[in-house]
UniProtKB/Swiss-Prot annotation:
Keyword list, A-Z: Bacteriocin immunity, Cell inner membrane, Cell membrane, Membrane, Plasmid, Transmembrane, Transmembrane helix
Lineage: Bacteria, Pseudomonadati, Pseudomonadota, Gammaproteobacteria, Enterobacterales
Record protein name field: Microcin N immunity protein
Name of the gene: mcnI
GO cellular component: plasma membrane
Function: Probably able to protect the producing cell against microcin N (microcin 24).
Native source organism of the sequence: Escherichia coli
One of the protein's GO biological processes: bacteriocin immunity
Membrane topology note: Multi-pass membrane protein
Length: 93
């Protein structure tokens, strides 16, 4: 399995979740709270989504790079979310 096939849906869901949870939630007004929320949401979605996908499809074979791909996809999601956050944050100032 290639990294692009593995990481597209978790990264996409992570970006959408960060947009809806962080940007639509008015109680996270501090930058530090929003950054922590972005990082936590990205890591959780990118680790839990592929794992649940394999458990639901009852595939008992997890390939060697599964956890590496989870970690790399979460890093990609965090970087994309932080770039979007800082672009929108500078535009709002």
């Amino acid at each position: 399995m290639s990294f692009l096939n593995f990481a597209f849906s978790p990264v996409f869901f992570s970006i959408m979740a960060c947009y809806f949870i962080v940007w639509r939630n008015k109680r996270n007004e501090f930058v530090c709270n929003r950054l922590l929320s972005i990082i936590i949401i990205s890591f959780l979605i990118c680790f839990i989504y592929p794992w649940l996908n394999y458990k639901i499809e009852v595939k008992y074979y997890i390939f060697e790079q599964f956890y590496l791909f989870c970690f790399l996809s979460s890093l990609v999601a965090v970087v994309i979310n932080l770039i979007v956050y800082f672009i929108l944050y500078r535009r709002c100032i």
